[in-house]
Amino acid sequence: MAEKLKIIPLGGLNEIGKNMTVLEYGKDMIVVDCGLGFPEDDMYGVDLVIPDVTYLAKNQKKLRGFFITHGHEDHIGALPYVLQAVNAPVHATPLTLGLIKLKLEEHDLVSKTQLVTHHPGDVVKAGCFSVEFIHVNHSIADAVAFAIHTPVGTVIMTGDFKIDPTSEDGMTDLGRFGMLGKEGVYALLCDSTNVERQGYTPSESVVSESLDRHFKGCKNRIIVTTFASNMHRIQAVFNIAHRHGRKVAVTGRSMDNILKVATELDYLHLPENTLVDLNQIKSIPKDKLVIVSTGSQGEDMSALYRMAFSSHRQVEIQPGDHIIISASAIPGNEKSISRIINELYRKGAEVIYDKLEGLHVSGHACQEELKIIHALTKPKFFIPVHGEQRHLQKHAALARQMGMNPKNILIADTGSVIECTPKTCKLAGTVPAGKILVDGTGVGDVGSVVLRDRKHLAQDGMIVVCVNLSSEDGSVLSGPDLISRGFVYMKDNEDLMDAMKMIATHSLEVCHNRNISDWATIKSTIKGDLSQFLFKNTKRNPMILPVIMEI
């Protein structure tokens, strides 16, 4: 039986983030992107979410390499964790590789990982696959799409892209997409993020014009916060500041790191004598200073957060400061951003943000740009990716409007196995593809049971019941003593605490009278009686933790 090409998304479908796709044929396998996701509201204490790589680990001998489209966290953020389980060469463009190296250094993995630099136009042989790098525009420099030449046909994966004719690093290589379309494209996997938006994504030059307008009319200090990875935006801030005779200081760890990498690799060209050390800003007049900061998403302890809440060592918000938030809110971050904006206003600052001005443009293609890619590539099969269910469905509808056979459009899910032959492309089962939760240094040790307990604690708090029992006859020597955490304030609820102590005492007496000495049964009895009493009297269900000590 002839081998089949398998396309297996391990993340990025029916979700935003965690982008990772496996291509497998016979004894060869490659992975495109290796990103992280951010925890949902009910994932208490979880820092990051990464793809489940059980399938990769089982097939590690087949793995020929990781191919990365660009340097955003949702495409590179899981690499330090995944490479510890399945190590293989990592292929990317210079800037993307520089950002990956920063992440691997934090985990002491640089010397253990083969990092391979490529440029648009390069074709890399990886087993039976030939992976071609194609230049695209995005909100970070050095982004690429991949044309993956397989035994079944050419698979194009656009990665995150848009079409920006005025981009600093040149327009998306539409000529190459068109040439591939003429040669024949088997399948197109295309970015669906902005499929709900009509028209074209505005150019980055729109933001530059808006920033210039605000700089021109401002007589006070300017603080600009944006995504640290948006090098075109940062370059624009430096250029505009220089034009208006202002110095620029930078604050925020990720901003410092990316500035260093991008400057070393010649992706950022800072005007001479414009960059100043943050410790020098007090000696610079307000109308001659710009501060570029992290914190555009309201992240706790980011530079802008620390400024807003007066915990930044070098920068204190002053009345009249102009703060420009040059970024749009990622879904879920709106409350955090609003909180910071309100705090900045409270300190007398003027805050200018995207809802009021054209201070941000997306890095993803809108409908007309998507239509261009579909028209140029003319794929036999189409698989919408990089989006939630509504995005995938809308993108499928757009493909149908472009005249594509509905039978050749596949709506897959994370974990779906897409089997491809020269004539057919169909869904054929699933592989493990859950969410691995990262909490501090723990990877995968927080599961549904732990999350359920954390949710329980967050909602109703906890009661600890401490009791000392005699090792001779099981009688109560002292206690029960109660400790409340997150349930009620004990001093204000003494009657309730006394009643709870009586219930626990009664539970212990019942067990003693029945000659029950098994600790598990005693604990279960205390928990059951207290839970029933508390729900009846308070309509709340705190976690109850009996602690028995034997003396």
Regions found by a protein language model. Give the residues of each.
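His/Asp/Glu-rich metal-coordinating catalytic cores
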Residues: 2-67, 72-283, 302-316, 335-339
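A glycine- and charged-residue-rich anion-binding loop/surface
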Residues: 13, 37-41, 62-63, 353-356, ...
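Short glycine-rich phosphate-binding loop at a beta-alpha junction
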Residues: 89, 383, 545
